[in-house]
Amino acid sequence: MKRAIITLAMLLCMVSLQAQTLLIYGGSDHDVFLGKLNADCYDSESIWNEYGTYGSKYSSKSIWNEYGTYGSEYSSYSPWNEYASTPPVVVDSRGNFYGYLTANEFISQRYSSRLVDFICRHYKQIRDDLSSWYNELF
């Protein structure tokens, strides 16, 4: 029941997000492409494509790689580090800045949406079953 309510809430927020593809960039200068936040799971650049560079939990450029620079909860470049000083940014294809993708609730200009807030709270469960969560959220 709880999962159904969360899924419904996510669907409502996705209507507005689907209008613009959101891109994730990480690294000290935010010049490392980390994938598309709201692309479908068949897009080769989607963070939801578990077989692609940005969705694989084994890829060095994936936020789902718990041992990697961009996916470890201990890395300052990871969205999952609650104390990250340089988390990834979310921008659109025109370069418009939406905010930082981070679990750090105290960082200035944190990107906050229902989808991102949900991902930041449940990233471990999502990482372990990416395709099922994609189907639930989208």
Kindly give the residue locations of the regions a language model identified.
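Sec-dependent N-terminal signal peptides
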Residues: 4-15
